[in-house]
Amino acid sequence: MTTIRTLVVAAEAFPLAKTGGLGDAVAGMVQALGHRPGGVDVQCELLMPAYRGTLDRLYRPRTVARLGGLPGGPASLVRGHCPGSGLSVLLLRNDALYDRPGIYVDDSGQGYPDNARRYAALAHAAARLAQGLPGLRPPHVVHAHDWHAALAPLLIHAAGLHYVKTLLTIHNLAFQGTFPAELASALGIPLACRHDDGALSDDRVNFLKAGIRYATRVTTVSRAYAREILTPAFGCGLHGLLRARGADLSPVPNGIDTALWNPAADPHLGGLRFDALDMRNKACCKAALQAELGLQLRADATVLAMGSRLTGQKMADVAIAALPALLEAHEHLQFALIGRGEPDLEAALRALAARYPGRCAVHIGYDEPLAHRLHAGADLLLHGSRFEPFGLTPLYAMRYGTLPVASRVGGMVDTIRDPGPAIEESCAGQGTGFLFDGSEPADMRQAVTRALRALAKPAVRDAMRRNAMQADFSWRTSAQAYAGLYANLASGPQRGRVPAPTLPLLANAA
């Protein structure tokens, strides 16, 4: 069997670095690919920046290459393995670029002003590895994730490395990595690609557009989102290019790490573990969560949880507007939130907690163990989104028998089964949650009210919880799809629709 060497390039991967779903998705995908999905032998190595503290998390790190001439200065490649998973990792080390308190933003929440150079350097390192470095065999496939890695397909193509195929996965089209066009030279973008049919959009360098334009194949993370991004409403200005690449665009849904998110074996729950066949400890998890967050200790309370970035995309503003009326109308309702984001939204949620002491708990920040306990102890998860490429958080919640109340957009259309408006025991069917249309507070309130009516019927509640906990959201099927794509890319003909300029890997602007 031929081994397909694949270099996975990403800005984050759990447990080395994580700010959200991207870190979980990359890590879960790479680990699943190590199990020969579909009988395909995939040898994955992950390339990511050496952020503060990541080197300390690697087993036996050693420097394997030094790279000069990168944007932001010279760097080194440090190879090691993740303890537990055994995942092979290459960290791009340049302390001036990456040794900082946050991954993307500073302590005030502002993006680092040199993020363009930071992630251009990552893409150039990927292109150097594609060329081959002493002691490091070149990959057959380079798999870039989101805008942070999206210059890699352009650079590999421009260097004439046609034997190395590239795959770009779009996790969130809204984040494109756009920067002033005058940075193009410093970022090492070839002159032949500095135009609107290349790496530029509206007179700005656009990392994600470059990746979509030059990658051999493009994927996104759910079937519904793959359809949505071809439309002006969801295409974020790139729908025309995506439609032009339609023959090379396909959905590969994400999965979740079902061993990590497993209420029957979750170390963060202590002795309060449970499963779909015996959910008695879920009530104990609720009591423990109430005590931890300062909520009233009421067994009859319904805990509505929210765990997400506090942004307009995640409809945090809508939740803030909808919650007071819900709390006033349902005296048994409690609200618990973990998240961080826009300062004004954080302040509004703190004010809500002060207005409803004992019924509303707000934890600003991200805490992985607490996130597990939140999903275990809550009854419902509120997950509104104006757009949602996939939606990992509802899947985590469902693993713990917490039913999502979510927007009918993107990946959640594929993963959440709504039993319909007339919720009786006989028609709970395969329902696993509740979907709503619209982005007004009234839309969200009506959906939560419908969910509360369902939970008031123990037979319906328990049936839906079992359905949710037993749904298969593992990486098995998705890993098989990626392995098949890699095999097709590695054995297929060269893609010929983009003319390859004869250019050095790092072109000079002069």
Curated annotation (Swiss-Prot):
Presence of the UniProt keyword Transferase in the record: yes
Listed GO MF terms: alpha-1,4-glucan glucosyltransferase (ADP-glucose donor) activity; alpha-1,4-glucan glucosyltransferase (UDP-glucose donor) activity
Transmembrane segments: none
Gene Ontology terms: biological process: glycogen biosynthetic process
SUPFAM superfamilies found in the cross-reference section: UDP-Glycosyltransferase/glycogen phosphorylase
Gene3D superfamilies, per database record: Glycogen Phosphorylase B (3.40.50.2000)
Positions annotated to bind ADP-alpha-D-glucose: K18
UniProt KW Mitochondrion keyword: no
E.C. number(s) listed in UniProt: 2.4.1.21
Any one Pfam family match given in the protein's UniProt record, by short name: Glycos_transf_1
Keywords annotated in UniProt: Glycogen biosynthesis, Glycosyltransferase, Transferase
Catalysed conversion reaction: [(1->4)-alpha-D-glucosyl](n) + ADP-alpha-D-glucose = [(1->4)-alpha-D-glucosyl](n+1) + ADP + H(+)
Pathway where this protein functions: Glycan biosynthesis; glycogen biosynthesis
Protein function: Synthesizes alpha-1,4-glucan chains using ADP-glucose.
Family matches, as HAMAP family: Glycogen_synth
Family indicated by similarity: Belongs to the glycosyltransferase 1 family. Bacterial/plant glycogen synthase subfamily.
UniProt-listed PANTHER family: ALPHA AMYLASE DOMAIN-CONTAINING PROTEIN, GRANULE-BOUND STARCH SYNTHASE 1, CHLOROPLASTIC/AMYLOPLASTIC
Protein name as annotated: Glycogen synthase
Species annotation: Bordetella bronchiseptica (strain ATCC BAA-588 / NCTC 13252 / RB50) (Alcaligenes bronchisepticus)
Gene: glgA
